[in-house]
Regions:
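Solenoidal tandem-repeat scaffolds enriched in leucines and small polar residues
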Residues: 26, 30, 37, 41-98, ...
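WD40/WD-repeat beta-propeller blade N-cap
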Residues: 9-15, 51-57, 93-99, 135-141, ...
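Short loop/turn segments that connect beta-strands within beta-propeller blades
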Residues: 1, 41-43, 83-86, 125-128, ...
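Conserved strand-to-loop turn within each blade of WD40 beta-propeller repeats
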Residues: 1, 12, 23, 29-33, ...
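Blade-level signature of beta-propeller repeat domains, shared across WD40, Kelch, NHL, RCC1
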Residues: 184-211
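WD40-repeat beta-propellers
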Residues: 18, 30, 36-40, 60, ...
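A structural motif specific to WD40 beta-propellers
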Residues: 3-6, 45-48, 89-90, 129-132, ...
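Loop/turn segments within WD40 beta-propeller blades
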Residues: 19-24, 61-67, 103-109, 145-150, ...
Length: 211
């Protein structure tokens, strides 16, 4: 039986997202109380409260280096944060509906936001420029991720499809069709040559990536 080390208390509403950093000494949590918090796993203490969103926080993620993290919100924005200082570095306001998921690539050079407006937006982390808006889904995008090589982005949508996009060009390279209802989750395997998608109708499908 596992032993509990800490109870992290501080949020005032549901916690819907959480992630460890790479070394495992920090956790970021996102809550419907509009805040994200960064916690020290060695002490259980809240290191920073990340404030600024005007709506529920839907998603969070650290970059691989652990010096940056992302938060996505129902307020239609995503924010890039300095983890050490707990300071907001930039606010991305390109979506016209709720931001439902965010993700860094493995290098931290790019990040992506996915929205209920049916698009995903790819950003250059260093410059803050939106390099591509991924357009093609006919419903909201609930999940987004990069492949391990950082050459492709995968999106999962309520339109019953997943799509794989080239990160260099923003072009859709593969559309995965077969689910009979909304797709809520998607992931690449470690090599990036296989994909799994999960749907509202209690099924998962495994696919071979063509990128």
């Amino acid at each position: 039986m596992g032993q509990e080390t800490f109870t992290l208390q501080g949020h005032a509403a549901e916690i819907v997202s959480l992630n460890f950093n790479t070394p495992g000494d920090l956790i970021v949590t996102g809550s419907f109380d509009h805040y994200s918090r960064i916690w020290d796993t060695r002490t259980g203490r809240c290191v920073h409260t990340l404030s600024g969103h005007m709506g529920e926080v839907s998603s969070t993620q650290f970059n691989w280096a652990g010096d940056l993290c992302l938060s996505g919100s129902i307020d239609r924005t995503c924010r890039l944060w300095d983890v050490r200082m707990g300071r907001c570095l930039s606010i991305k306001q390109g979506h016209t509906d709720e931001v439902l998921d965010v993700a860094f690539d493995c290098t931290g050079a790019r990040f992506v936001s996915a929205s209920a407006d049916g698009t995903a937006q790819v950003y250059n982390t260093k410059t803050g420029e939106c390099t591509h808006t991924l357009v093609g889904h006919e419903g909201e995008i609930s999940k987004v991720c990069f492949n391990p090589q950082a050459t492709a982005v995968m999106t999962a949508s309520s339109d019953k499809t997943s799509r794989i996009w080239d990160t260099a060009t923003g072009v859709c390279r593969q559309t995965l069709e077969g689910h009979t209802d909304e797709i809520f989750s998607c992931a690449f395997n470690y090599e990036g040559d296989f994909i799994i998608t999960g749907s509202k109708v209690n099924t998962c499908r495994i696919w071979r990536s063509e990128i």
